[in-house]
């Protein structure tokens, strides 16, 4: 039986911490930023934790 491959798109978008949480980047901070307020762009910085149901699906895609 061959090894399972992890989903390459998911592996680029998500990161699993040592404790098992799944982190993602917040959407909406790539381009078209000049009309967005500083408050919005500041709120979009940093990583967010995935909801438990979604995290289970992502872990399956990553083979964890």
Swiss-Prot record:
One of its GO terms (molecular function) is structural constituent of ribosome. PROSITE patterns: RIBOSOMAL_L35. SUPFAM superfamilies: L35p-like (SSF143034). GO terms for cellular component: cytosolic large ribosomal subunit. The keyword Ribosomal protein applies. Keywords: Ribonucleoprotein, Ribosomal protein. One of its GO terms (biological process) is translation. It comes from the Bacteria. Belongs to the bacterial ribosomal protein bL35 family. This is Large ribosomal subunit protein bL35.
């Amino acid at each position: 039986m061959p090894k399972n491959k992890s989903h390459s798109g998911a592996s680029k978008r998500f990161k699993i911490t040592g404790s098992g949480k799944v982190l993602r980047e917040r959407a909406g901070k790539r381009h078209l930023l000049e009309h967005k307020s500083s408050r919005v762009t500041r709120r979009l910085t940093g990583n967010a934790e995935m909801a438990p149901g979604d995290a289970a699906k992502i872990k399956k895609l990553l083979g964890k």
